């Protein structure tokens, strides 16, 4: 059993390439729209989106299909959930993989305080997302523009773009991302239109509420049932992913203390499942079919 957790602003649809490949390789695959997204519930209360609730959703899925354990794979914010769920429910996840975001230790201060210490007076999108209202309205005004700009987020080596994203000022988030003038080569119009239709229907508040739980998550994970992840763990990243610039990847083994591995895809950006689906699928299958990992997964399903 493999459970796939999408990120922001994504959907279960974002895993469409991997679902087929994993199923053809013999795995049972669950790829839900997570709470706040797509066809799943969108509770109004911000506290409904804590990492404990999101992790409990995954356990509930396993219970629903009668599976005691699963390998857990997450991308972007889905990787945050994937790295946290084995700490909260260590008996339910036999292996874990995170895409674009590696496992990082819990900061010494609440997460938004840690971000403010790093970014100071500069603009940082996660801090902008904290206040209900402004970001919700900005992203929902024109979902096609929102998604087109987010999917075209520049790579880490685009210094001018990085400066635009950080410069203090009254403008919101999207104005800092240049209009790309078209779709990136990794997504066609039909697939893009599906995203637009879904986010036009649901808007972005449920998705943004995940970000508004950062500090509450910090409180809730102070003393999890497991202090570290001892299950086999894999991080898959893109060498051109701008988000890695502010992620302490060098501390990953403080969290994943068992069999931890990394695969960096040369030239890849942030949207790995769609930008380089074959590379991602190959890395996942090499991990899942490794004799050590495979034995653990198979023994957990008996």
Give residue spans per PLM region.
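Signature tryptophan residues that serve as conserved aromatic anchors
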Residues: 8, 12-15, 77, 83, ...
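Flexible "cap/lid" subdomain of the alpha/beta-hydrolase fold that forms the substrate-access gate
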Residues: 37-73, 77-260
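Catalytic active-site module of serine/aspartate enzymes centered on a nucleophile-bearing elbow/loop
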Residues: 259-302
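Conserved residues in the N-terminal Rossmann fold of short-chain dehydrogenase/reductase
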Residues: 31, 237, 264
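Conserved HGGG/HGGXW glycine-rich cap/lid loop of the alpha/beta-hydrolase fold
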Residues: 1-41
């Amino acid at each position: 059993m493999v459970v796939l957790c999408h990120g922001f602003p994504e959907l279960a649809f974002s895993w469409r390439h991997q679902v087929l490949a994993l199923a053809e390789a013999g795995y049972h695959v669950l790829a839900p729209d997570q709470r706040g997204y797509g066809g799943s519930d969108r509770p109004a209360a911000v506290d409904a989106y804590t990492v404990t609730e999101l992790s409990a959703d995954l356990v509930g899925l396993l219970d629903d299909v009668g599976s005691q354990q699963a390998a857990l794979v997450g991308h972007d914010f889905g990787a945050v959930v994937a790295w946290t769920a084995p700490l909260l429910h260590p008996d339910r996840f036999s292996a874990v993989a995170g895409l674009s975001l590696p496992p990082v230790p819990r900061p010494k201060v609440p997460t938004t305080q840690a971000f403010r210490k790093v970014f100071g007076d500069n603009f940082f999108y996660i801090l902008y997302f904290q206040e209900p209202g402004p970001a919700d309205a900005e992203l929902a005004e024109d979902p096609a523009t929102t998604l087109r700009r987010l999917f075209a987020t520049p790579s880490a080596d685009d210094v001018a773009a990085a400066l635009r994203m950080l410069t203090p000022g009254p403008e919101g988030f999207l104005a800092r991302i240049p209009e790309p003038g078209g779709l990136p080569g990794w997504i066609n119009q039909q697939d893009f239109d599906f995203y637009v239709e879904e986010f036009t229907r649901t808007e972005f508040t449920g998705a943004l509420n995940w970000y508004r739980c950062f500090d509450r998550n910090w409180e809730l994970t102070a003393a999890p049932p497991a202090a570290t992840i001892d299950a086999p763990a894999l991080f898959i990243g893109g060498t051109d992913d701008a988000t890695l610039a502010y992620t302490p990847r060098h501390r990953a083994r403080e969290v994943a203390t068992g069999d931890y591995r990394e695969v960096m895809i040369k030239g890849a950006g942030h949207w790995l499942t769609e930008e380089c689906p074959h590379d991602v699928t190959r890395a996942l299958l090499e991990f899942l079919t490794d004799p050590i990992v495979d034995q653990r997964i198979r023994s957990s399903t008996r």
